[in-house]
């Protein structure tokens, strides 16, 4: 299988670097100037400085390059995915498309695989998700991710193609569970960042992670997912990494909220839109997701951090 990565952000670049160490790979950039710059310097200095590109990694801004590839990794922000797929439908039709973003579409409430199937129905849709930072992957540090794909035979072939010496993939056919785990951990990371930013302590963070995980499971099971999926890399694993590191943009957004500081609006933070979309879905489905709703209220400035903590602590006592 021949692989191309669409999207020259930090994560897309890191995946392309890792794959190119194994076999020739193509990285597609939206901007010709950006592609020319990367080709010239052999480094994506704008998005992933300090990570030189292997010789086997080709860089282009020509979408026609997809004709030579069987597998396309889509490293495109969740809220821009539908527009991107619609604009390039002809080039993507009939391919194996692997979404590499984590989130819920604000307008539809759909995850990345559902959006793929909705916009390019004749493509094979898969999802690559789990605990990872771009720099770790680019540097060749040990990383394990979840590859969600149905049917499993296609998943096996993709698993073999996309695994590298340092990037180990575990597969599942539970696309719904993998989608929800990867999306909602960003919401919980915002909450955890907020309590650390407000100096409410690591005990509060642990409580939010644990009860946030319960919310992730609640929604996933209501959507027909398997509980073991959420206990794996795409759920618990990603939650653990994202809620404990300032390398996470979602956690850093939470820190800013907790400290009462402004956050750079140019930085993509998938958890903000996901919180709003999920709060709406939970209300429609009659699910209790108080942490998700609280994060939405914080983002929309309907609550202060102090009020949010007070509101969560004063909820009716219940059995765990």
From Swiss-Prot:
The keyword Isomerase appears for this protein: no
PROSITE patterns in the record: NAD_G3PDH
Pfam families: NAD_Gly3P_dh_C, NAD_Gly3P_dh_N
InterPro entries hit by this protein: 6-PGluconate_DH-like_C_sf (IPR008927), 6PGD_dom2 (IPR013328), G3P_DH_NAD-dep (IPR006168), G3P_DH_NAD-dep_C (IPR006109), G3P_DH_NAD-dep_N (IPR011128), NAD(P)-bd_dom_sf (IPR036291)
Compartments it resides in: Cytoplasm
UniProt keyword list: Cytoplasm, Lipid biosynthesis, Lipid metabolism, NAD, NADP, Nucleotide-binding, Oxidoreductase, Phospholipid biosynthesis, Phospholipid metabolism
Primary location class: cytoplasm
Record-stated family: Belongs to the NAD-dependent glycerol-3-phosphate dehydrogenase family.
Protein name per UniProt: Glycerol-3-phosphate dehydrogenase [NAD(P)+]
């Amino acid at each position: 299988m021949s692989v191309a990565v669409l999207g020259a952000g930090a994560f897309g670049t890191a995946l392309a670097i890792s794959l190119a160490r194994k076999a020739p790979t193509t990285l597609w950039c939206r901007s010709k100037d950006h592609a020319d710059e990367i080709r010239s310097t052999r480094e994506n200095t704008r998005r992933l400085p300090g990570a030189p590109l292997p010789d086997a990694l080709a860089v282009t801004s020509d979408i026609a390059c997809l004709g030579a590839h069987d597998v396309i990794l889509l490293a495109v922000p969740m809220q821009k995915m539908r527009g991107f797929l619609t604009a390039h439908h002809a080039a993507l039709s009939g391919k194996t498309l692997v979404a590499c973003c984590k989130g819920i579409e604000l307008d539809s409430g759909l995850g990345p695989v559902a959006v793929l199937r909705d916009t390019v129905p004749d493509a094979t849709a898969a999802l690559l998700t789990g605990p990872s930072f771009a720099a770790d992957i680019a540097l060749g540090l040990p990383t394990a991710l979840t590859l969600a794909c149905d049917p499993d035979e296609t998943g096996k072939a993709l698993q073999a193609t996309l695994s590298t010496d340092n990037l180990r993939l575990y597969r599942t056919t539970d696309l719904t569970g993998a989608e929800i785990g990867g999306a909602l951990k960003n919401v919980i990371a915002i909450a955890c960042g907020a309590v650390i930013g407000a100096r409410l302590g690591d005990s509060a963070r642990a409580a939010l992670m644990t009860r946030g995980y319960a919310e992730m499971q609640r929604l996933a099971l209501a959507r027909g997912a398997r509980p073991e999926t959420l206990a794996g890399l795409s759920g618990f694993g990603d939650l653990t990494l994202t809620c404990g590191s300032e390398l996470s943009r979602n956690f850093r957004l939470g820190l800013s909220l907790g400290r009462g500081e402004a956050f750079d609006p140019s930085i993509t933070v998938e958890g903000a839109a996901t919180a709003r979309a999920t709060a709406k879905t939970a209300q429609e489905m009659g699910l209790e997701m108080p942490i998700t709703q609280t994060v939405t209220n914080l983002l929309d400035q309907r609550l202060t951090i102090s009020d949010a903590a007070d509101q969560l602590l004063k909820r009716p006592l219940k059995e765990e």
